[in-house]
């Protein structure tokens, strides 16, 4: 991680932390580096590809459940920058795990394929973002209930 700027280092650190289970950081770090060292089909830097993929998946708005007079409404709201990045990474990893279960291939290949799909604005992580934006636009008439 020598020639990376602060944002890229933070993104890789978040990726490792989200993927880590039972405190096995070195194992997860090796998987992440194998993912990044896979031969890319593009000529771009793989870390830059990951940053752009996360940018394509970041949600702008989300919905929160608010109870008013005994009725629960889905109220749309703006997502903070850190939460945008967190949700994007989480969705990419969830999609990679689902792809791994359905196709029975290595996690490195699944992660790289999902990052490539996110970069090209397709895949299940992008679909999840579009579904969330659709839900927020459907419920935008309840935006006046937002008081947080």
Swiss-Prot record:
GO biological process, alphabetically ordered: translation
Record has Repressor as a keyword: no
Sample GO molecular function, one term: structural constituent of ribosome
UniProt KW keywords: Mitochondrion, Ribonucleoprotein, Ribosomal protein, RNA-binding, rRNA-binding
Cellular component terms (Gene Ontology): mitochondrial small ribosomal subunit
Gene3D superfamilies per UniProt: Ribosomal protein S7 domain
Entry-linked InterPro entries: Ribosomal_uS7, Ribosomal_uS7_bac/org-type, Ribosomal_uS7_dom, Ribosomal_uS7_dom_sf, RPS7_plant
Pfam families reported for this sequence: Ribosomal_S7
Cellular location(s): Mitochondrion
Domain of life, source organism: Eukaryota
Keyword NADP listed: no
Family of the protein in this entry: Belongs to the universal ribosomal protein uS7 family.
Quaternary structure (record): Part of the small ribosomal subunit.
Function per UniProt: One of the primary rRNA binding proteins, it binds directly to 18S rRNA where it nucleates assembly of the head domain of the small subunit.
Misc. comment: A stretch of 270 kb of the mitochondrial genome is duplicated within the centromere of chromosome 2 resulting in the duplication of the gene. The expression of this duplicated gene (At2g07696) is demonstrated.
UniProt name for this protein: Small ribosomal subunit protein uS7m
Organism field: Arabidopsis thaliana
Taxonomic lineage of the native organism: Eukaryota, Viridiplantae, Streptophyta, Embryophyta, Tracheophyta
């Amino acid at each position: 991680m020598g020639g990376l700027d602060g944002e890229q280092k933070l993104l890789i650190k978040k990726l490792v932390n989200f993927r880590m289970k039972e405190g096995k950081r070195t194992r997860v770090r090796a998987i992440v580096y194998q993912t990044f060292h896979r031969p890319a089909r593009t000529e771009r830097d793989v870390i830059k590809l990951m940053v752009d993929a996360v940018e394509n998946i970041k949600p702008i708005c989300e919905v929160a459940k608010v109870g008013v007079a005994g009725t629960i409404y889905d109220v749309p709201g703006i997502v903070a920058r850190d939460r945008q990045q967190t949700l994007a990474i989480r969705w990419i990893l969830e999609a990679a795990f689902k792809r791994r279960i359905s196709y029975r291939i290595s996690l490195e290949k699944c992660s790289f394929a999902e990052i490539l799909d996110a970069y090209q604005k397709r895949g299940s992580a992008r679909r999840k973002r579009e579904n969330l934006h659709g839900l927020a636009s459907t419920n935008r008439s309840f935006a006046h209930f937002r008081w947080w």
